C-alpha cells in the first residue's frame, strides 16, 4: 500500500526508516508500559501522583471504535492520577470543531490519496488547511518546502525523513493505530478493483451466474 514509495522492491517502509534513521521510530523496548517510570517523570514535572495536573479533555466522534479507544486513554491516564474527560460529538459537529482547532486533545485520521510520505507529513506544515492542531515549526516547514522543490529523489526523501524526525521529537501527533480494511467478496463477483488507498472500483464489475 502507500508508505513504501521509497522502498526497494520487496522491502517495506519500516526497513527504509531503519536504514535512514538508524532504527525504528517505535522501539518496543523503549515504549513498553512502565507506570512507575511515568509517575516518576510526572513528579519531576511538578505533579506527584497527578496532583495539580489540570483536567484534560479528549474529543472524538461517535463512530466505530473511537469511543473504546477514548475510554482506554482515559483509563491509562487515570493510572497516573490524571483526569481525562471524554467529549463525544456527532460527525457533523466534530469535523468543523476539529478544523477550527477548538479542542485540547482530539482524535484524527488520514487516508493517503497519493503514494508519497509528503501526503501525510504536509498535513503538519504551518500553512496546511488540514493542520487542525495548529502545529508550527519553521524548520519542519523549511524541510517540507525543500522536499517539495527538489527534483532529486534521494534528496526528496532525505528531507522528508528529517522533517519526520522533528515532528516525532515535538510530539506534534501521537500515532495510535494503522487501520486495516477487512472485506468479504462473493467469488461470482468479477472485475472489481481495490486500490492500495482503500478505494473500491465497480465500473467493470460483473456477476457470474
Model segments located where?
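Active-site-proximal beta-strand/loop segments in catalytic clefts of secreted hydrolases
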Residues: 59-61, 89, 109-111, 177-180
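Short, polar/charged alpha-helical segment
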Residues: 67-80
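Short, well-ordered beta-strand elements
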Residues: 53-62, 84-86
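Extracytoplasmic/peripheral linker and loop segments enriched in polar/acidic and small residues
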Residues: 1-4, 26-32, 83-94, 119-187, ...
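Structural transition elements
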Residues: 1-44, 63-67
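Long beta-strand-rich cores associated with HINT superfamily self-processing modules
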Residues: 183-209
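Acidic-aromatic pocket-rim loops
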Residues: 8-15, 92-149, 195-196, 201-203
Amino acid at each position: 500500500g502507500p508508505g513504501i514509495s521509497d522502498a526497494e522492491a520487496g522491502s517495506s517502509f519500516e526497513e527504509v526508516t531503519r536504514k535512514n534513521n538508524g532504527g525504528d521510530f517505535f522501539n518496543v523496548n523503549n515504549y513498553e508500559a512502565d507506570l512507575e517510570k511515568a509517575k516518576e517523570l510526572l513528579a519531576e514535572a511538578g505533579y506527584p501522583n497527578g496532583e495539580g495536573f489540570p483536567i484534560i479533555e479528549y474529543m472524538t466522534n461517535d463512530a466505530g471504535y473511537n469511543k473504546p479507544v477514548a475510554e482506554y486513554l482515559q483509563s491509562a491516564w487515570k493510572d497516573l492520577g490524571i483526569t481525562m474527560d471524554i467529549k463525544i460529538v456527532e460527525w457533523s459537529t466534530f469535523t468543523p470543531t476539529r478544523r477550527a482547532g477548538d479542542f485540547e486533545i482530539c482524535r484524527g485520521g488520514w487516508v493517503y490519496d497519493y503514494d508519497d510520505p509528503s501526503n501525510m507529513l504536509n498535513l503538519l506544515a504551518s500553512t496546511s488547511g488540514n493542520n487542525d492542531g495548529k502545529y508550527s515549526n519553521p524548520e519542519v516547514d523549511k524541510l517540507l518546502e525543500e522536499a517539495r522543490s527538489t527534483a532529486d529523489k534521494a534528496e526528496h526523501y532525505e528531507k522528508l525523513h528529517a522533517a519526520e524526525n522533528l515532528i516525532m521529537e515535538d510530539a506534534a501527533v501521537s500515532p495510535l493505530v494503522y487501520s486495516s480494511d477487512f472485506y468479504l467478496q462473493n467469488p461470482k463477483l468479477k472485475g472489481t478493483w481495490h486500490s492500495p488507498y482503500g478505494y473500491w472500483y465497480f465500473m467493470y464489475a460483473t456477476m457470474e451466474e
